[in-house]
């Protein structure tokens, strides 16, 4: 809450986060993928069913898009990993109004890359757009096979 009593326009509430392990796994296995020199982004539409054929029960239709961040231990010590998380979350928070809605995004850094705000900020929105297009094209291919 801001001092004026209204909600902050650019926030990152828990409802905007991918938190369950099954949601991460689903996005990593079935989502569209895009990468650049420092980040890998996976995008998966909210309405993709689980293995049992049902959409996730707790996914709200009011959520525009959600972010999950996964930082492998090979990335560095806790200080380095937490810096990556902060920078990726900030890039999402500042650009969430520009991102396609209805998707879960899972982001991870590439190995042996130093966290640089300019690189993350510049590439984040572009990678999300590319991952969404790939996710949609793979969904189109799988629907024609059925």
Curated annotation (Swiss-Prot):
Q: PANTHER family under this entry?
A: RIBONUCLEASE P PROTEIN COMPONENT (PTHR33992:SF1)
Molecular function terms from GO = 3'-tRNA processing endoribonuclease activity; ribonuclease P activity; tRNA binding
Similarity field: Belongs to the RnpA family.
Q: Which BP terms in the Gene Ontology apply to this protein?
A: tRNA 3'-end processing; tRNA 5'-leader removal
Q: State its role.
A: RNaseP catalyzes the removal of the 5'-leader sequence from pre-tRNA to produce the mature 5'-terminus. It can also cleave other RNA substrates such as 4.5S RNA. The protein component plays an auxiliary but essential role in vivo by binding to the 5'-leader sequence and broadening the substrate specificity of the ribozyme.
Hydrolase among keywords: yes
| SUBUNIT field | Consists of a catalytic RNA component (M1 or rnpB) and a protein subunit.
Among the entry's GO cellular component annotations, what is one? Answer: ribonuclease P complex
Q: What is this protein called?
A: Ribonuclease P protein component
What is the native source organism of this protein?
Rhodopirellula baltica (strain DSM 10527 / NCIMB 13988 / SH1)
Keywords, in A-Z order: Endonuclease, Hydrolase, Nuclease, RNA-binding, tRNA processing
According to the lineage, what is the superkingdom? Answer: Bacteria
Q: Its Enzyme Commission number? A: 3.1.26.5
List the catalytic activities from the record. Endonucleolytic cleavage of RNA, removing 5'-extranucleotides from tRNA precursor
In terms of InterPro entries, this protein maps to:
Ribosomal_Su5_D2-typ_SF, Ribsml_uS5_D2-typ_fold_subgr, RNase_P
């Amino acid at each position: 809450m801001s001092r004026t009593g209204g909600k902050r326009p650019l926030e990152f509430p828990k409802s905007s986060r991918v938190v369950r392990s099954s949601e991460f796994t689903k996005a990593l296995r079935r989502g569209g993928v895009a990468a650049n020199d420092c980040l890998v982004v996976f995008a998966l539409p909210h309405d993709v069913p689980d293995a049992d054929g049902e959409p996730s029960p707790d996914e709200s239709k009011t959520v525009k898009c959600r972010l999950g961040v996964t930082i492998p231990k090979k990335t560095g010590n806790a200080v380095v990993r937490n810096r990556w998380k902060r920078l990726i979350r900030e890039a999402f928070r500042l650009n969430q109004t520009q991102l396609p809605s209805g998707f879960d995004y899972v982001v991870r850094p590439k190995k042996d890359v130093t966290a640089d705000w300019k690189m993350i900020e510049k590439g984040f929105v572009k990678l999300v757009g590319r991952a969404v297009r790939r996710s949609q094209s793979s969904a189109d291919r799988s629907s024609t096979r059925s």
